[in-house]
């Protein structure tokens, strides 16, 4: 049964605003060449890079919280209508209005690029569809496993995936080399930790919220250290891409998500106390 979770509303809203800010700064840098590329602005953008991964988390959290290990009848048909059709229409439009092809051949090239090669910002819809399938196939098995161990393992896998793309040169094989290109953005392995975090928090939401305040300082310190780690990677030139596909993003996004729920738990406690006083 669907239930309203206020923290998800705020997570979604802040993630949307963050994406707008990220692209506004990037567009300013790319279109106005006389604007200096400020390091402080780039670091500010990095702080907002939780946005796209958070949508993966939110999708799986809501699915796990509302339906558990099962999926309601007509689920995939519904998603194909409300996500699949817009995905096609938006990519067809981007291929024409943004790339401005000179002929049909160019247009079809851009359509193929945006649809199947991650050539447009809509690529995250493909990622979310992959996780819908994974939830359908594996959720009943995931419930029987240790959540903390699975989340830690998934963070390591996701981190190693982005580290591979960052620090290892692509192979000569053109099919494998595609993983190092934009196609690699669309593979679920690079987003696995957000999926499992969403699944387990959604599945055990009540128990999670009852316990989260016990780990207040762990979460705050962990978030602070993850920011320092991310900033150092950028400043020292270890990873200078300003995007969510970074080696330090999985742990950073995890801590940001936990901060949202931690803050929500204290807000709920405050409202409960006020109601009791009345």
Model regions: which residues?
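Aromatic-anchored segments of alpha-helical transmembrane domains
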Residues: 21, 92, 155-167, 222-235
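Hydrophobic alpha-helical segments with transmembrane-like composition
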Residues: 97-171, 182-197
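Functionally critical transmembrane alpha-helices in membrane proteins and complexes, commonly lining
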Residues: 6-65, 83-91
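Interfacial loop-to-helix transition and helix-capping segments at the boundaries
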Residues: 41-52, 113-127, 168-194, 232-258
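Transmembrane alpha-helical segments and their boundary/interface "anchor" motifs
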Residues: 45-54, 66-97, 104, 108-120, ...
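Short, Lys/Arg-rich, polar N-terminal cytosolic tail immediately upstream
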Residues: 1-4
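Conserved small/polar residues in nucleotide/adenosyl-binding loops
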Residues: 271-278
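Structural signal for the C-terminal ends of transmembrane alpha-helices
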Residues: 63-69, 137-143, 199-208, 262-269
């Amino acid at each position: 049964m669907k239930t309203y979770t206020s923290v998800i509303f705020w997570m979604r809203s802040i993630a949307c605003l963050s994406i707008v800010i990220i692209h506004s700064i990037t567009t300013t840098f790319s279109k106005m060449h006389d604007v200096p590329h400020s390091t402080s602005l780039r670091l500010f953008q990095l702080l907002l890079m939780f946005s796209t991964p958070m949508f993966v988390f939110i999708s799986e959290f809501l699915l796990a919280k509302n339906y558990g290990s099962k999926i309601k009848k007509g689920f995939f048909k519904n998603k194909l209508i409300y996500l699949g059709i817009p995905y096609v229409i938006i990519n067809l439009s981007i291929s024409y209005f943004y790339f401005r092809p000179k002929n049909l051949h160019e247009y079809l090239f851009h359509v193929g690029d945006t649809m199947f090669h991650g050539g447009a910002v809509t690529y995250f819809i493909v990622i979310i569809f992959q996780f819908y399938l994974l939830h359908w196939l594996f959720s009943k098995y995931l419930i029987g496993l240790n959540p903390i161990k699975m989340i830690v393992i998934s963070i390591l896998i996701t981190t190693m995936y982005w580290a591979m793309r960052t620090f290892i040169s692509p192979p000569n094989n053109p099919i494998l080399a595609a993983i190092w290109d934009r196609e690699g953005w669309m593979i679920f392995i690079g987003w696995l930790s957000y999926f499992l975090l969403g699944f387990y928090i959604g599945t055990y939401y009540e128990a999670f919220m009852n316990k989260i305040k016990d780990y207040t300082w762990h979460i705050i310190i962990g978030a602070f250290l993850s920011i320092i780690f991310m900033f150092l990677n950028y400043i020292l030139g270890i990873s200078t891409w300003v995007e969510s596909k970074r080696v330090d993003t999985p742990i950073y996004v995890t801590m940001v998500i936990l901060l949202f729920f931690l803050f929500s738990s204290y807000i709920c406690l405050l409202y409960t106390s006020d109601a009791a006083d009345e």
